[in-house]
Structure formats: structure tokens, C-alpha cells
Amino acid sequence: TYESVEEIRNLISTLSKDVLVIIDEAYIYYETSVEVPTARAVLDEFPNVFIMRTFSKAYGLANYRVGSMMSSAELANYIQTIRLPYNLNTLSQVAAEAAFGDREFL
């Protein structure tokens, strides 16, 4: 279900600042009915928000278990401290780099 950035902003503003909000933009590349489908703008207002995207849908990399994340620097630094045991293998990293670099494919 697509929610507008304003609806997302309104929801987040009602939550406690210690609640982690994860916005799933797995299908962002398929959304054509709005001018700016991403909730990226809320990252500047709310430091407790993650926006996550998968490469399995638009990039066709379901078997590689790769994606991307946007967040405040503070949350990104925290993720770096726990990421290592769950890091990607080399093949997944190479596939993700190649897919991400091929903007014409999208």
C-alpha cells in the first residue's frame, strides 16, 4: 500500500522518538502514480527513521539478499557496529554493484 509522504510524516510525528520507524520502499521503482514516491524527505526531520529498499524486485537479485538503507548518520553508525556477522558474500556484493550501476535497466 502506498502512503503519501505527508501521511508518513503525520504518523511518525505521533510516535515517541525512541521508536524505530522502518519504511519499506521495496516497490519504489514500480510506483508511477505520484511525482515523488519516496519518503526520503522525512529523514531530515526524524532521526529515528530507516528507509529500506531491496534489490530483489526491480534489480532481479532475489537470490542475492541485497538491498540498500537510508538513515541518519547516527543510525547508520550503529548498524555498522552490528553488520559484520551478517555481511554479504563477495558474489552478492559484486552483483549488487553491477545492478546498481546499470541505471538504464530500471
Task: Describe the residue ranges of each PLM region.
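Active-site pre-lysine segment of PLP-dependent enzymes
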Residues: 1-21, 27-58
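PLP-dependent aminotransferase class I/II
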Residues: 48-106
